[in-house]
């Protein structure tokens, strides 16, 4: 069976995929790489890390949250395997200029934040017991490195027309900052399915793990 690779976002580590690994691994190989070190090295390093991982397989299914979703989109755009499947949550194909400028301004402020305060802000919306683990996992990501990554990710644009994989686009129904972007992404992926994760915010796979995992499992089985 095609392996499933789970890609975490900026404010979490691979431990945030615990509920999905537990639920999905009996049926298939599930891999959740630690991308924090790659994130600390920048966008290209993170993409290359995932590229190396996916190149070990003829076919892979990708599931990414937030920045992990953006990387999943980039990798899917580079691969031509039509039998693969792609699941992204709280991701986008490109930020509008105004929002991109806003993220760049936020990145400038991020550089000035004390490391401990920044990390606590990053994990603030993650439910326990995963919050404390995420706080430990993101330790290598300092303010300067995070600011650079924010600028680079905000400038990324994905050629969705190059994506052959069947796609499921998700977003937490309470993730107001990303709802419009997620819908726009789905509209740019021909034949994709869009679904809201009920009672979930940005970290939808933990906010409502049962609903998120159910949507993913149903899509993979279809």
For each predicted feature, which ranges?
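Conserved alpha/beta-hydrolase catalytic His-Asp/Glu region
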Residues: 113-162
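Flexible "cap/lid" loop of the alpha/beta hydrolase fold
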Residues: 77-78, 83-113
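Catalytic histidine-centered segment of alpha/beta-hydrolase-like enzymes
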Residues: 200-213
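Conserved alpha/beta-hydrolase "acid-adjacent" motif
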Residues: 176-182
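Gly/Ala-rich beta-loop-alpha elbow adjacent to hydrolase catalytic centers
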Residues: 64-68, 72
